[in-house]
Amino acid sequence: MKDGAHHRPVRRTISLVLAGGRGSRLQDLTENCAKPAVHFGGKFRIIDFVLSNCVNSGLHRIGVLTQYKSHSLLRHLQHGWSFLRNEVNEFIDLLPAQQRVDEASWYRGTADAVYQNIDILREHDPKYILVLAGDHVYKMNYASLIEDHVALGAPCTVACIEVPLAEASAFGVMTVDAMRHITRFDEKPAHPQPMLDQPEQALVSMGVYVFDADYLFAALQTDIEDAASHHDFGKDLIPAIVSRGEAMAHPFDLSCVKSSPESPSYWRDVGTVDAYWAANIDLTATIPQLDLYDKDWPIWTYQPTSPPAKFVFDDEGRRGMAVDSLVSGGCIVSGALVRRSVLFTGVHLHSYSSVEESVLLPEADVGRHCRLRKVVVDEGCRIPAGMTIGFDAEDDARRFHVSADGVVLVTVAMLEALRVSQA
């Protein structure tokens, strides 16, 4: 484990993972599950990255706050994250919306979700609360972040990263002075403020916050009494704390876990089909910026029992082969060609087909003589023999969902609708 993972501030910290969001920008990928439960990287779920960061940082007291279509997420956590031991005060508590405050209230926002569980948090007597978005992909040593929070001496610390100005309107945009005080915070502004020394960049919140526990509890109480509040960290709580001059910034570079010092810091909000596709395809690089093979900082998950991947046939024009790709257990590449793609568990590709720059989720089946390029195929899809996807934008748009950057999303429901229309 990395240095600093077991310092006392970490042992006095409870981590809260906000995992209740629908993630509607991912279109039909979140039709049946919350965004943190979406598959990623060949064998993982998105939430595995933030939970692995917690465990690898020595944070073993974790609450996961869920709401939207949480069944698959809860099942994944029960199967893959039950190894922490309650008898030594380690746990992952599942905290679905239970109308704890009044019978009419589900979680009305991210801040309200934490507020409704204050009584549970107080039982553990934490000194610090680490609040984490459960839908981002990155590797971070939270112990370093918490130690920085303690050293800075402010009651609230917000982790931040630089992004291109053109992308900043999707995030909370921050202005920070030379001493790292946050002087301004705008949630998803239409016209984001650029960095003073880098006019093409903006400094944005990563959705990662550290609070002194008693301070957070008081701030949440004040927020809940404000009838005009959305009860959201980004929209309400953080701007209010910034306005009082009580929030500090923590640059991601200070705690990013990298394979080598010269590697760039990698953090992705995979909240759109384009971003989701791109982050998966990033992993096919010879040396990807996000290293899944780092034994010092493993990404933990639940992996169902499956046989090894298999590649069969070696005939001219019918050769089972994958190049610059991730191929998971249980896959069968039968006389098909795969280039720069990610195949999740149990994918089956039949003869004479080709798959390029595509992401195929578990148990997808691609028939003979198919051609796929820049496609995301949802779990359990069966692509009929001879189908071509990703080569004709107009034809693709009539049948499936085509993103702004030309990624084609294919789901079981779309294929069924197409079958019915052609019957």
Curated annotation (Swiss-Prot):
Segments traversing the membrane: none
Domain of life: Bacteria
UniProt cross-references to InterPro entries, sorted A to Z: ADP-Glc_PPase, ADP_Glu_pyroP_CS, GlgC_bac, GlmU/GlgC-like_hexapep, NTP_transferase_dom, Nucleotide-diphossugar_trans, Trimer_LpxA-like_sf
Gene Ontology terms, MF aspect: ATP binding; glucose-1-phosphate adenylyltransferase activity
UniProt KW keywords: ATP-binding, Carbohydrate metabolism, Glycogen biosynthesis, Glycogen metabolism, Nucleotide-binding, Nucleotidyltransferase, Transferase
UniProt keyword annotation of Nucleotidyltransferase present: yes
Enzyme Commission number: 2.7.7.27
Enzyme superclass (EC): transferase
Residues that bind alpha-D-glucose 1-phosphate: 107, 172, 187-188, 205
The reaction(s) this protein catalyses: alpha-D-glucose 1-phosphate + ATP + H(+) = ADP-alpha-D-glucose + diphosphate
Family, per entry: Belongs to the bacterial/plant glucose-1-phosphate adenylyltransferase family.
Subunit structure and binding partners: Homotetramer.
Descriptive protein name: Glucose-1-phosphate adenylyltransferase
Species per Swiss-Prot/TrEMBL record: Albidiferax ferrireducens (strain ATCC BAA-621 / DSM 15236 / T118) (Rhodoferax ferrireducens)
Upper taxonomic lineage: Bacteria, Pseudomonadati, Pseudomonadota, Betaproteobacteria, Burkholderiales
Gene name in the database record: glgC
